[in-house]
Amino acid sequence: MTDKKTLFIDGKEVEFTDEPNLLEVIRKAGMNVPTFCYRPDLTSFGACRMCVVEVEGRGIQSSCTMPPEAGLKIHLNTERTRRIRKTVLELLLANHDKSCLTCEKSGNCELQQYAEEYGIRKIRYPDKELDEYLPVDDSSPSIVRDPNKCILCGACVRACTVSYTHLRAHET
C-alpha cells in the first residue's frame, strides 16, 4: 500500500498516492486543466503548454510534466495562467487552418472549444504564409494527416512510436 500525501489545489486539500504528474492529481480531484498533448497512456511531453498551473515558490509549471510533491500549493486559473493559455491558443491558431473558428466540426474540436472559452474571436497573429494549403497526407492506411490542422502536439508521433506502426516492411 502506498502512503497518501497531501497537496493543495486552489486552497482545497487533495490527497494523492502514485499519480505520475500534477495533471493526474488535478483530474482525480475532479478539477480540469486544458491540454492538447497529454495522453495518460503515453510519456508526458509538455509540448502544448495549455496545462500550465501556478505553483507557489516555483512559478508557472506544465502540470503534465511536473511530479506531485507533498505540500505543494497549486493555483489552476490565475490571471497569469489564463493569459498564458490564451497566448498559446492564439499562436496555435496563427499556424492553423484559417477557417478554424467557423469550422464544420463546430463544437467537436478542442481547439475551437478552448478558443471560445478564452474569448478568441479572431486570429491575432495571422500567418501570411498560410494562404496556400499544404496537401493532405493519406498515404497511411491508419492515419490521415492534414498538416493544415496539425497543432504540433506530438500525440500521433508518440502513439505510433509506442504501437510500432512506425516500423516499415522490407519493400519500403
Regions from the language model: what does each represent?
Residues 143, 147-159:
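Internal active-site segments that recognize and position negatively charged phosphoryl groups
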Residues 25, 91, 156-159, 163:
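Generic, well-ordered alpha-helical scaffold segments in large soluble proteins
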Residues 165-172:
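Conserved small/polar residues in nucleotide/adenosyl-binding loops
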